[in-house]
Swiss-Prot record:
Domain spans labelled SUI1: 103-174
UniProt cross-references to Pfam families, sorted A to Z: DENR_N (PF21023), SUI1 (PF01253)
UniProt subcellular location: Cytoplasm
Protein name (record): Translation machinery-associated protein 22
A single BP term in Gene Ontology: formation of translation preinitiation complex
GO cellular component, as recorded: cytoplasm; ribonucleoprotein complex; ribosome
Disulfide bond sites: none
Subunit structure: Interacts with the 40S ribosomal subunit.
Family of this protein: Belongs to the DENR family.
Any GO MF annotation of the entry: translation initiation factor activity
PANTHER family: DENSITY-REGULATED PROTEIN, DENSITY-REGULATED PROTEIN HOMOLOG
Amino acid sequence: MADVEESTAPAEIQSRHVVYCGVCSLPPEYCEYGGTVKKCQEWLEKKYPSMYERLWSEDALAAATSTLSVDAQKRAAKDATKKAAKAEALEAKQNETLASSKIRIKRVERNKRKYVTEVQGLEAFGLELKKVAKEFGSRFATGSSVTKVASGGQEITVQGDVSDDVREFLIKNYKNIPKKNIVLEEPKKKKAEPVEV
């Protein structure tokens, strides 16, 4: 047994570190297929400049399109401008929707002297309703739940008359919600009808 066989043990498998985009949560190589290419590029340039140079520099883009025919290059340029225009229009529409969205905080009488506070419109600002309901419950030491509304949306119902406190809590903890978009709706009191004697 002069020949000693060296057992080739497989090398230890190394895990790869994959960078995910902070905007669209895809790897940066796939950001071009999402709808937020501009934002993704800005994020990548700020966080990982070397990767940005590798993917989006003029040289990298020229190298990627150099293998295409002239017609294909024209189509690619046309598609890129179309996608950019579509993304800008979508972003403008989202900004307009956010600007016009209102958060309605209503105090509703449950029975005689008991009230609940209803909060509608939080989902327009990208907030997770269950998480916010849990924060309300712990902050105000009351029951808080997400309920479905007849119109098809959802609202947060908080036990007790805490409408002013909810407004202050939202302004303080969620800076992305403009103060003017939070509306307190007071229920109109019914006028007592005159009693005929």
